[in-house]
């Protein structure tokens, strides 16, 4: 058994346990099991996974993310906002605009501060990756996947696929409250046409500036919010002519709202809140709670 300090934070209800590796040390081989342990609502803390705030050779800070099933992810928009808040409020960075390293590359964060507290964060998520090979999805490597027919479980759907450093597939629905998140989501997540799995998004278009959104996250299942997924939904909606490029779009997630723009410079920018829930000491007992 050993213990470590943690902070629980959330972005629109998408909650993770954050461990500051500027101050703590965790064995690399234990990280998947620790993620499963802290995520458990009965024997752990309860969260969508584990995020490590790490030193970096490329930026002031690095983010590593482990899903609730122990798998390591490449990117997390809500996690990035929380990492930015933590890094600024704990003195890891002093500038209000700074880089964060992720497994999918460097991203720029800009914090809005009131009375020393970060109240919102804007993340430059970079350019979406649209080639089929970059998502990745099987089929002609150079093609985009826009309004493509997709057969599964004996039914035909229309999908658009986007990578924001992690894979997303978007289904449009007429009523977000009736979206088959828990039935279609897990089936599509593990479909062989997505060799690395995929995050599954359901989107209802309200107007050119407003979307309703629900998500089945790869490795975590239903979550309250997914920042990269909301970005992918806006990109997909522009590609399908449902929203406009360079216009702020409000995305209503189960946990709250994000404002997202796919700019004419090619970059996707996301603005939203980040909240600290609690801090404490976690006692990790290996197999007993991992």
Swiss-Prot record:
Q: Give the enzyme class.
A: isomerase
GO CC terms, sorted: cytosol
Residue(s) at site: Could be important to modulate the pK values of the two catalytic cysteine residues: 168, 217
Q: Name one GO biological process term.
A: lysine biosynthetic process via diaminopimelate
Q: Which positions are catalytic residues?
A: 76 (proton donor), 226 (proton acceptor)
Q: Kindly list the positions annotated as binding substrate.
A: 14, 67, 77-78, 166, 199, 217-218, 227-228
Q: Where in the cell is it found?
A: Cytoplasm
Q: What is its EC number?
A: 5.1.1.7
**Pathway noted in the entry:** Amino-acid biosynthesis; L-lysine biosynthesis via DAP pathway; DL-2,6-diaminopimelate from LL-2,6-diaminopimelate: step 1/1
Any GO molecular function: diaminopimelate epimerase activity
Q: Which reaction does it catalyse?
A: (2S,6S)-2,6-diaminopimelate = meso-2,6-diaminopimelate
One Pfam family this sequence matches: DAP_epimerase
What keywords are assigned to this protein? Amino-acid biosynthesis, Cytoplasm, Isomerase, Lysine biosynthesis
Say what the protein does.
Catalyzes the stereoinversion of LL-2,6-diaminopimelate (L,L-DAP) to meso-diaminopimelate (meso-DAP), a precursor of L-lysine and an essential component of the bacterial peptidoglycan.
Q: How does it assemble?
A: Homodimer.
Family statement drawn from the similarity comment of this UniProt entry = Belongs to the diaminopimelate epimerase family.
Q: Which PANTHER family match?
A: DIAMINOPIMELATE EPIMERASE, DIAMINOPIMELATE EPIMERASE, CHLOROPLASTIC
Full protein name: Diaminopimelate epimerase
Species annotation: Geobacillus thermodenitrificans (strain NG80-2)
């Amino acid at each position: 058994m050993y213990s470590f300090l943690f902070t629980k934070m959330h972005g629109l209800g998408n909650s993770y346990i954050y461990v500051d590796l500027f101050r703590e040390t965790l064995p690399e081989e234990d990280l998947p099991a620790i993620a499963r342990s802290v995520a458990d609502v009965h024997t752990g803390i309860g969260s969508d996974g584990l995020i490590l705030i790490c030193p970096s050779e490329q930026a002031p800070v690095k983010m590593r993310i482990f899903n609730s099933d122990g798998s390591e992810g490449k990117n997390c928009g809500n996690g990035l906002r929380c990492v930015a808040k933590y890094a600024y409020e704990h003195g890891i960075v002093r500038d209000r605009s700074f880089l964060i390293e992720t497994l999918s590359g460097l991203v720029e964060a800009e914090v809005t501060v009131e009375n020393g507290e970060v109240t919102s964060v804007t993340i430059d998520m970079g350019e979406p990756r649209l080639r089929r090979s970059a998502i990745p999805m099987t089929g002609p490597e150079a093609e985009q996947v826009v309004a493509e027919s997709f057969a599964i479980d004996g039914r035909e759907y229309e999908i658009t696929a986007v990578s924001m450093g992690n894979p997303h597939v978007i289904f449009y629905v007429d009523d977000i409250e009736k979206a088959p998140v828990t039935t279609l989501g897990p089936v599509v997540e593990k479909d062989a046409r997505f060799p690395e799995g995929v995050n599954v998004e359901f989107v209802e278009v309200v107007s050119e500036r407003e979307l309703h959104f629900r998500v089945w996250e790869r490795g975590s299942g239903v979550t309250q919010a997914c920042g990269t997924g909301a970005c992918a939904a806006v990109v997909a909606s522009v590609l399908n002519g449902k929203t406009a490029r360079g216009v702020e779009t409000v995305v209503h997630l189960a946990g709250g709202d994000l404002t997202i723009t796919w700019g004419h410079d090619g970059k996707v920018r996301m603005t939203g809140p980040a909240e600290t829930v609690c801090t404490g000491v976690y006692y990790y007992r290996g197999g007993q709670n991992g």
